[in-house]
Amino acid sequence: WLPIFKANCIAPLLLTQLLYRNFLLGNQKKIVFISSKPASITENTGGSMYMSRSSRSALNQVIKSLSVDLIKEGISVASISPGWVKTDSGGINALIDVHTSVTGIKKIINELRLENTGKFWDYNGELIPW
């Protein structure tokens, strides 16, 4: 469990801390994290997936806190779920192809502003409740 928590939650925060000064220098000050819809506490009606759900839920808490802390620096922060994507890890039953996921993620990043910082987005542009 700890290796998954380190990869999904701790490493993204440490990387953000290491790159913080770089974010301040950017023209478009945006930090985007890839989470997953199963990390939503509100949307959890299926149970199971304890390691993945809990580590990504913890990441979402980090993301929300960063959005509050960094807004004064003009940095927008978002959590994005790429959807269930047809990849080696997503498997053949996944619902969307890579192009659909990436196109949606790119659109969300392009539209990310301080006004909508601290949100949890699905790849299709819909908000996911925390």
List each language-model region with its residue ranges.
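Catalytic loop of short-chain dehydrogenase/reductase
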Residues: 1-6, 10-14, 20-71
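Flexible, glycine-rich beta-alpha linker
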Residues: 39-41, 68, 72-96
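C-terminal helical subdomain
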Residues: 79-82, 91-130
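Ser/Thr-centric signal marking residues that sit
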Residues: 16, 87, 117
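A short, hydrophobic/aromatic-rich structural module that often spans a beta strand
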Residues: 27-36, 80-89, 110
